[in-house]
């Protein structure tokens, strides 16, 4: 895949609305053209020990951060026309839908692709697991700061460039032959059985 935006959310607690950071890597023409990292004030605004142990963020880190709507207003125009790619996309898509609903925002129905699901199809049992760092290593990318949203998004982008094919282009509808009459077109739509019963 050559044109997409890789995305990764980290959350402050077990609620999918509690996104506390987002990393986005925009790829066009097979090249990374933009990287975005933002802290977000989570909702609900509290951290659990186990989430902090995963990504290292605390209440103090996001105390003065913007709420999701302000952050997304900056990001949304950059994603126009691009599919989104995530590793374990049901989680990130679930977070994105949840915060849109929480803040009464219209969800744009982003098209998501999943590098984890694709890895299972491409590599299968050749890998011990299909976690992000494992797949990244298999694709020749060294993920040094796992669970930092931007680092994870960049790893996801590098994987997607290698293993997710470009989506098929929609077929163009054939134009009717210039010599075809309207009556002939309607006749072609009449089921054969109906014609026989006339």
Regions found by a protein language model. Name each.
Residues 94-95, 155-158:
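Amphipathic alpha-helical interaction segments
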Residues 108-119:
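Conserved beta-strand -> loop -> alpha-helix junction used to position metal-binding or nucleic-acid-contacting
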């Amino acid at each position: 895949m050559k044109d997409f935006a890789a995305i990764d959310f980290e959350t402050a607690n077990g609620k999918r609305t509690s996104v506390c950071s987002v990393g986005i890597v925009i790829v066009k023409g097979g090249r990374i053209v933009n990287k975005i990292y933002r802290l977000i004030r989570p909702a609900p605004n509290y951290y659990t020990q186990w989430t902090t142990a995963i990504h290292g963020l605390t209440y103090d880190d996001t105390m003065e951060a913007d709420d999701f709507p302000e952050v997304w207003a900056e990001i949304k125009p950059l994603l126009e026309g691009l599919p989104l790619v995530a590793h374990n996309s049901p989680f990130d898509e679930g977070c994105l839908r949840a915060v849109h609903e929480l803040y009464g925002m219209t969800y744009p129905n982003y098209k998501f692709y999943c590098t984890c699901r694709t890895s299972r199809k491409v590599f299968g049992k050749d890998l011990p697991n299909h976690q992000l760092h494992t797949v990244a290593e298999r694709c020749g990318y060294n993920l040094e700061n796992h669970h930092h949203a931007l680092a994870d998004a960049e790893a996801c982008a590098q994987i997607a460039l290698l293993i997710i094919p470009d989506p098929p282009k929609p077929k163009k509808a054939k134009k009717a032959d210039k010599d075809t009459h309207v009556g002939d077109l309607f006749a072609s739509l009449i089921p054969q059985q109906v014609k026989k019963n006339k």
